[in-house]
Amino acid sequence: LKTLQRNPDIVWRVEKRRQQAVLDRLKAGEDISEEGTVILLLSGMMHQLNLLGGEIWTLCDGQRTLAAIVDILHQEFAVERAELEADVQEFVDDLLQRGWLNYAKSTD
């Protein structure tokens, strides 16, 4: 099984207070799609990931497959599974292409 892992050269952190504020706004029905909750530092550049992107990034720990990540997120977010799966796949494909994620080497 192909598990996803973050590029170890990328320094990152979860902005906990900001994440909680974004979650509160989400519960209130506000649009939070542009709100960054995870900060990545790469080649002197700072990048922000929104709530869903940050959750995906955090779950790419080398232990989980794409399907396992979708399963976890489907329990957290009130979204149709097929739509969520397509969004996660698109996001992961983008990060794979950028070299920010890769597939963990199989230990089998």
Model-assigned labels for residue ranges:
Residues 1-54, 58, 104:
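Acidic, low-complexity/disordered tracts enriched in E/D and polar residues
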